[in-house]
Regions:
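Alpha/beta-hydrolase superfamily serine-hydrolase fold, recognizing
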Residues: 1-229
């Protein structure tokens, strides 16, 4: 079987660098799944913008494809980073760049406008994410782009361009992104994209990354997605 390389784009609301939780998760993940992991270092806002990160990660991806054409490449990310991998894959499809074999998104932020009225019902349940803070961060990150640009808010894109990738999405019921993620997964399926949605009942944002027993089941699902990509 061809070797798999994972490009992991970390979250942090577009304003934070990689943190120890990410690194510990990636250590467990690489060991369980037996894959190589590349973690692009992008400059968060206000030092960098979406356009900068897209340039950097696209360069890494195209170089990897040229040097190792035989490898499977899976894009993976959490939170803001999981929103970004969809934006990147959509952008690559429109540019005619080869699609990643798999996309694995953990608690993805798929609509930077956060305009879905259903979000209000989840604010009390979510101990991690703050809507007002995310609004500010999204505008800083967008730079010259609009926050509703499909590269930043992939829920607004023509998702049929992702048909060449297998998509796996994981989300908890106790996070403000939950209604958007469920809607997004439905839109992917409707657009003809092979999509698996895994819902963590009573789980919080980014729960598969946390060092808790409940993270083992999603890790196994991620491993299966790797094998099937």
């Amino acid at each position: 079987a061809p070797h798999t390389t994972v490009i992991f784009v970390h979250g942090g609301g577009y304003v934070q660098g990689i943190n120890p939780t990410h690194l510990l998760f990636l250590h467990r993940f690489a060991r369980q799944c037996g894959v190589s992991v590349l973690v692009p270092d992008y400059d968060p806002a206000p030092y960098g913008t979406a356009a900068d990160a897209f340039r950097r990660i696209t360069g890494l991806y195209t170089t990897l494809r040229e040097k190792h054409p035989e490898e499977k490449v899976v894009l993976m990310g959490d939170s803001a980073g999981a929103g970004m991998i969809f934006g990147l894959a959509i952008d690559w499809a429109t540019q005619g760049i080869q699609a990643p074999e798999g996309i694995i998104a953990i608690s993805p932020w798929v609509d930077a406008t956060l305009s879905n009225p259903e979000i209000d019902a989840y604010v009390e349940r979510d101990p991690m994410l703050d809507v007002n803070r995310l609004h500010v961060d999204a505008h800083a990150w967008a730079g010259a782009w609009n926050v509703s640009d499909p590269r930043i808010s992939p829920i607004r894109a023509d998702l049929s361009v992702l048909k060449n990738s297998d998509v796996t999405v994981l989300v908890g019921t106790d996070e403000i992104f939950y209604p958007d993620v469920v809607d997004f997964a439905q839109r992917l399926t409707t657009a003809g994209v092979r999509t698996k949605l895994h819902i963590g009942e009573k789980m919080i944002h980014d729960y598969p990354l946390l060092p808790i027993p409940e993270a083992q089941e999603p890790m196994n699902r991620i491993e299966m997605a790797m094998i099937e990509a």
